[in-house]
Amino acid sequence: MTNSSFFCPVYKDLEPFTYFFYLVFLVGIIGSCFATWAFIQKNTNHRCVSIYLINLLTADFLLTLALPVKIVVDLGVAPWKLKIFHCQVTACLIYINMYLSIIFLAFVSIDRCLQLTHSCKIYRIQEPGFAKMISTVVWLMVLLIMVPNMMIPIKDIKEKSNVGCMEFKKEFGRNWHLLTNFICVAIFLNFSAIILISNCLVIRQLYRNKDNENYPNVKKALINILLVTTGYIICFVPYHIVRIPYTLSQTEVITDCSTRISLFKAKEATLLLAVSNLCFDPILYYHLSKAFRSKVTETFASPKETKAQKEKLRCENNA
């Protein structure tokens, strides 16, 4: 190791971040549990968008498993073995959730785009069987990229404070970590382009048909588009701006101590935004899933509003 590895206190002063991670965890676990209950209670019609949302919810539960461990480790009260477990397992779960979320949000955008721009046609990609198949492929692909980070042997280093996960990695582990980060950035860029193009096509179609009385509710469609796009930008874009420079500081390509500390703090701040998708996803379920929306109405609305919502849902299903 270089001297900067010994004397640069990169991994300190994390306590302020932990309170925000804890808040995200509390809101997220409540929202995810309610979403699970709603999807189980309501017999969904297994449209493509519902399949993608259920996969998104499953990925969110991985994040709820990982966040408590990260919080304890960042508070500095975790035993040494838990720190090692976090570096090998739970940190990877956070990134598995992140890239599954990015990919499934892209498929949700594609599905919405095809529904609104080609409402009279059903493409192969819109069939539930295809959605299940592609969801399986996505899970396998992301796990294939991430799981080796859990399995590659690590160094047996002496217990100490101010230690980062990279210090546990041997040379092959460091190289795989670097490769993984570049692959994940490529995934982010490609699926971001898909989301942007899909949403632009939808907006163009809505604009062309704004005077058509038979066209679906334009305002509702635009809200859905803006919801997905805004949530995506807030959660994932800042993190990926920081990701590559921070990775270079981890591998000591960037050696200046103050720069490394700044990049680490920026990474933690933007990672907080990224995991906050756990809080935004239940809002997404509400706007995109009839089953979830109906269950929310039944649970929290007055009997009169519940009856009106059921009648509206029945009309939508018969349409």
Curated annotation (Swiss-Prot):
It comes from Homo sapiens. Gene3D superfamilies: Rhodopsin 7-helix transmembrane proteins. Its main location: membrane. GO terms for molecular function: G protein-coupled peptide receptor activity; G protein-coupled purinergic nucleotide receptor activity; G protein-coupled receptor activity; neuropeptide binding; neuropeptide receptor activity. The chain crosses the membrane at residues 22-42, 49-69, 90-110, 133-153, 182-202, 225-245, 269-289. The keyword Transmembrane helix applies. This is G-protein coupled receptor 171. Glycans are attached at N3. PANTHER family: G-PROTEIN COUPLED RECEPTOR 171, P2Y PURINOCEPTOR-RELATED G-PROTEIN COUPLED RECEPTOR. GO terms for biological process: adenylate cyclase-modulating G protein-coupled receptor signaling pathway; G protein-coupled receptor signaling pathway; negative regulation of myeloid cell differentiation; regulation of feeding behavior; regulation of sensory perception of pain. Belongs to the G-protein coupled receptor 1 family. It is found in: Cell membrane. Expressed in both T-cell subsets and natural killer cells, while it is undetectable in B cells or CD14(+) monocytes. Expressed in peripheral blood mononuclear cells (PBMC) and Jurkat cells (at protein level). It comes from the Eukaryota. G-protein coupled receptor for Big LEN, a 16-amino acid neuropeptide produced from the precursor protein, proSAAS (encoded by PCSK1N). Acts through a G(i)-alpha-mediated pathway in response to Big LEN. Big LEN-GPR171 system plays an important role in regulating feeding and metabolism. Also plays a role in modulating fear and anxiety-like behaviors in the basolateral amygdala. Big LEN-GPR171 modulates the mu-type opioid receptor signaling and antinociception. Acts as a negative regulator T cell function. Keywords: Cell membrane, G-protein coupled receptor, Glycoprotein, Membrane, Receptor, Transducer, Transmembrane, Transmembrane helix. Residues 1-21, 70-89, 154-181, 246-268 are extracellular. GO terms for cellular component: membrane; plasma membrane. It holds the Pfam family 7tm_1. It is a multi-pass membrane protein. Residues 43-48, 111-132, 203-224, 290-319 are cytoplasmic. InterPro entries: GPCR_Rhodpsn, GPCR_Rhodpsn_7TM, GPR171.
